């Protein structure tokens, strides 16, 4: 199979969808891996690295896309990339369609088969292709929040761990999943006072046991959120409704209760954000201020640590890429119900219910198309 790996074009996105090691595995199975020239440079992988792995380089972007049967990406396709897709091609990447109606309609119009990393499930539960980037994003959220608390960044001028005689920052993490746990773990390690809010008592029990009571665990209610808003120096939104838009948990009105110079980091921005005042930002201009509260809403946080992220992503995606390349999308998904959960769009049909409901579009059962 002809497998194309384009260079990511989203603002400050330095990751690449495949490492040279991953390319070598695919080439060894008889597949033709075509990598856009310079695609891996941002992640520290040279063209020579890919050539040594047996991949071919292609400088002509149009030819790369036109010749491809399977296209591997990291971020959702940008407008010019959607225009390059055609019927018969398979796109495998993060899509996050519930936050992007125009992208959803563009992919439907393309006629391509689009499989989303983030909606693939695992037999033991969880989202195996979202987890590695969620781990990175959770840890980065604390770094970003700590930096945003600095006075020069518009923050209150608070050092996250404090110093002897001065209290540490109060950090609240909304959501105790992969992102939330990694954010809480990072903040705890830096010496902050950490509280995690979640709707799942079993999850809170797990966190309490795992971290031996060193972080507060609180059942998430309206009262708990209001208290967090009043007391926290840094709030990290780590809420996930798989494949659907994130709920707005902190409203514009609630900002008036926050401390001046406090910080909101919205890791859920890929799914529309979990704060009413959130809007996507970039690594070039990561923050803005609303009512005295600093907002950090970068939609591709792991892109800033591209080498780590690319390696972690390829480790997770490669078995699925191998299945697609060896079997074709239809048999690969027919053989694995958990993989089939990743199908979002096929031949002009929308096959992910939460996205269809978000935009009032017709929904078609994926199973009816997989066979």
Curated annotation (Swiss-Prot):
GO CC annotation: plasma membrane
Pathway, per record: Amino-acid degradation; L-alanine degradation via dehydrogenase pathway; NH(3) and pyruvate from L-alanine: step 1/1
Molecular function terms, GO-annotated: alanine dehydrogenase activity; metal ion binding; nucleotide binding
Enzyme class: oxidoreductase
Keywords: Magnesium, Metal-binding, NAD, Nucleotide-binding, Oxidoreductase
Catalytic residues (UniProt): 96 (proton donor/acceptor), 270 (proton donor/acceptor)
Record: residues binding NAD(+): 134, 198, 203, 220, 239-240, 267-270, 279, 298-301
UniProt xrefs under InterPro entries: Ala_DH (IPR008141), Ala_DH/PNT_CS2 (IPR008143), AlaDH/PNT_N (IPR007886), AlaDH/PNT_NAD(H)-bd (IPR007698), NAD(P)-bd_dom_sf (IPR036291)
Cofactor(s) annotated in UniProt: Mg(2+)
Binding site for substrate: 15, 75
EC number: 1.4.1.1
Chemical reaction(s) catalysed: L-alanine + NAD(+) + H2O = pyruvate + NH4(+) + NADH + H(+)
PANTHER family, sorted: ALANINE DEHYDROGENASE
Name of the protein described by the UniProt record: Alanine dehydrogenase
Organism of provenance: Halomonas elongata (strain ATCC 33173 / DSM 2581 / NBRC 15536 / NCIMB 2198 / 1H9)
The gene coding this protein: ald
């Amino acid at each position: 199979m002809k497998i194309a790996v384009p260079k990511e074009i989203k603002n400050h996105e330095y990751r690449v969808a495949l490492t040279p090691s991953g390319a070598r595995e695919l080439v060894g199975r008889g597949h033709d891996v075509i990598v856009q020239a310079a695609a891996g440079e941002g992640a520290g992988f040279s063209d020579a690295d890919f050539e040594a792995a047996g991949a071919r380089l292609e400088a002509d972007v149009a030819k790369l896309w036109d010749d491809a049967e399977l296209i591997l990406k990291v971020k959702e396709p940008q407008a010019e990339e959607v225009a390059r897709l055609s019927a018969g091609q398979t796109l495998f990447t993060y899509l996050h369609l519930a936050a992007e109606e125009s992208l959803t309609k563009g992919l439907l119009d393309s006629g391509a088969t689009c499989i989303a990393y983030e909606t693939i499930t695992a037999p033991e539960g969880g989202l195996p292709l979202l987890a590695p980037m969620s781990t990175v994003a959770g840890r980065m959220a604390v770094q970003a929040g700590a930096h945003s608390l600095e006075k020069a960044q518009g923050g209150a001028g608070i050092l996250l761990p404090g110093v002897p005689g001065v209290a540490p920052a109060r950090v609240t993490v909304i959501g105790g999943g992969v992102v939330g746990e990694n954010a809480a773990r990072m903040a705890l390690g830096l010496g902050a006072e950490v509280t995690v809010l979640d709707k799942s008592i079993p999850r809170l029990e797990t966190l309490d046991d795992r971290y031996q009571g060193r972080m507060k665990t609180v059942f998430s209610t309206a009262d708990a959120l209001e208290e967090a808003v009043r007391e926290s120096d840094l709030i990290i939104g780590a809420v996930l409704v798989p494949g659907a838009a994130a709920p707005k948990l902190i409203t514009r009105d609630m900002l008036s209760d926050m401390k001046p110079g406090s910080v909101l980091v919205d890791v859920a921005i890929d799914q529309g954000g979990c704060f009413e005042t959130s809007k996507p930002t970039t690594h070039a201009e990561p923050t803005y201020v609303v009512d005295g509260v600093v907002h950090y809403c970068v939609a591709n946080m792991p892109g800033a640590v591209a080498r780590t992220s690319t390696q972690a992503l390829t480790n997770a995606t490669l078995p699925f890429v191998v299945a697609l390349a060896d079997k074709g999308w239809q048999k690969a998904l027919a053989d694995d119900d958990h993989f089939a959960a990743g199908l979002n769009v096929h031949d002009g049909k929308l096959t992910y219910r939460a996205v269809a409901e978000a935009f009032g579009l017709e929904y078609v059962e994926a199973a009816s198309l997989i066979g």
